[in-house]
Each structure stands twice: as structure tokens, then as C-alpha cells.
Amino acid sequence: DVVAKSDWVVPAVVPAILEDVLGPVLPALRDKIVVSIVSGWDFARYEAFLAPGTHHISTIPNTPIAIGEGVLACESTHNLTEAEYAQFEETFGKIALIVPVTAAQFGPAGTLGGCTPAFTAMYLEALGDAGVKYGLSRAAAYQMAAQVLIGTGMLYLESGLHPGVLKDGVCSP
């Protein structure tokens, strides 16, 4: 019933149960746009599973999408029409940087974009812990560390300078 009333379907389940979840509604997906965020399900795998003619694109998001600052790797091979893809970009571009990649790059891009928030949180925690060790309050240390990460990322994005140049531009190591 939900699928019948929807223009888009966004499967967001663990890979092991995707076939069980979508199987019963496969015929209803033919006139929908399927935007998958299921890990390990690329264009070729969906083509073999979905009803012929179903329009779909595979993506891998990351958790900062929750605040409109995410990264969304999307497989450049898809069968959305030009208008559907423009609608996809318009919709998801509001919450993420959309990075089209080839099928061969889809796994690594998903890992980089999808897993890096966890590594960054660990780094943020370590920076904060170091600040606490040397006398800063935990709140101040985490706030400073978070702003340094944001600022450095924005400096890179806005300047276009290689990260090594940014690193070398710091006066003290």
C-alpha cells in the first residue's frame, strides 16, 4: 500500500533481507524510482533482481546526511531518465554532496564516504582527550576540535589547495 502511494522507494535495510522486503512488491516498483541505500547492491545486482524497466540508482550515504552535510556516493550506471536524475540531484543535493562513481569505484567510495564519519569521530575524541589531558574542559576541547575539523575541511573545499599545502601552511607542527 505504501509503495502504491509513493513516487520514490528508498530501500534502507540490511542487505541480507532486501530480497524478502522488496520481493512481494516487485511488480509495483516498475513505475517508481528506486533509490537504494543498501550496501553491496549495485546496478547490475538490482537489474538481475528487479522487474524489467524498473528505474533505479544505487547510493551509499553517510550519517552527516542527518544534518544536511552528508556525502552520497552514487553509481554512475543507472537507468533513471534525465528528468528523474535531475530530480534525484535536486532532492538529495539538499542534504549531501553527490559524488557519481563507476561500478568499480562504488565500494571504495562507499567505504570512504560511509565509514569516515566513524574514524573522524574517533579522531575528534582523541583530540578532545588530548585537550583535557592538558587542562581544557571536555566541552571546550571537543568544541575546539570539532571546529578545527570543520574549518580545515571548508578551507580545503573553498581554496582547492592540496591537503599537503594546507598542512605545510601551519606555522607549528
Language-model segment annotations:
Residues 156-167, 171-173:
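Mobile late-domain/C-terminal helix-loop "cap" segments
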Residues 13, 38-41, 104, 147, ...:
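Short beta->alpha linker loops
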Residues 2, 18, 137-144, 166:
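Small-residue helix-packing motif on alpha-helices
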Residues 1-74, 78:
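Rossmann-like NAD(P)(H) cofactor-binding subdomain of soluble oxidoreductases
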Residues 45-55, 71-109, 119-161:
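Internal alpha-helical scaffold of NAD(P)-dependent oxidoreductase catalytic cores
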Residues 112:
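Alpha-helical membrane segments and immediately flanking helix-loop junctions
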